[in-house]
Amino acid sequence: MNKKDLDQQSQHWENSFSNKPEMFGLDPSEAARHAKEIFESQKIKNFFSRKSIDIIELGAGLGRDTTYFAANSNLIQVTALDYSSEAIKNINKKKTDYYSDPTMTDGKSAADKITTKVWDVRNGIPYKDNTFDGCFSHMLYCMALTTSEIIKLNKEVHRVLKPGGINIFTVRHTGDGDYKKGKHIGEDLYENDGFIVHFFDKEKINQISKEFKIEDIFELYEGSFPRKLFVVTQRKK
């Protein structure tokens, strides 16, 4: 596996976000809609003890899910991380342009409930143990990361979640039409149109989930192609 191929992805994403600031559209992902319901249901069941639900979003991209969480829930506060400075700049602009009016029941704006940070998760997660109620990431785990890097990342997610915290992530799976198409990078990573994707089967999900209890795995289709995803819900033991 050529590490250079993996490392060059950050610049490729930077350029893509700069040239296509709405490349994923404005509507939230179906996975984010599902995650919001799960996070709020945990609060209702008193799994989350604080008044707010503090979640961290990894690989937030251009913020379509970040802003959805903040604008459509009186409970959820989001810390959004992405290694692209263009992505974080875009989220911050949306906060100012569209989400700064105080529309929440507590007098806050949706923008008040979003914190952003430029950060590469290959370097860990820069927060203390037991900080967050939940974690959400849409197709981050299936980016240009090796299996060992994904295992390390999931251990970091486990560390920053509070006991009983929920981790919800999506990955493209080996039934996807792009699997084994394009340039083989190594493991189950393939490059198409400049983007590297790590494809998952359920065995790999189990492999990276040793610290968690897997509560749910279901399949979701996204887009017209479509991308074929697993949506995984884990709970910190």
Feature map (PLM): residue ranges:
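Class I (Rossmann-like) S-adenosyl-L-methionine-dependent methyltransferase catalytic domain
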Residues: 1-124, 167-237
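Non-membrane alpha-helical structural segments and their capping/turn regions in soluble enzymes
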Residues: 85, 147-151
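A short acidic, Gly/Pro-enriched loop at the edge of an enzyme's catalytic core
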Residues: 122-135
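Surface-exposed loop/turn positions
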Residues: 131, 164-165
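A short SAM/SAH-binding and catalytic strip from SAM-dependent methyltransferases
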Residues: 134-148
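Short conserved AdoMet
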Residues: 145, 162, 210
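A short glycine-rich, Lys/Arg-flanked "PGG" loop and its adjoining helix->strand segment in the class I
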Residues: 151-163
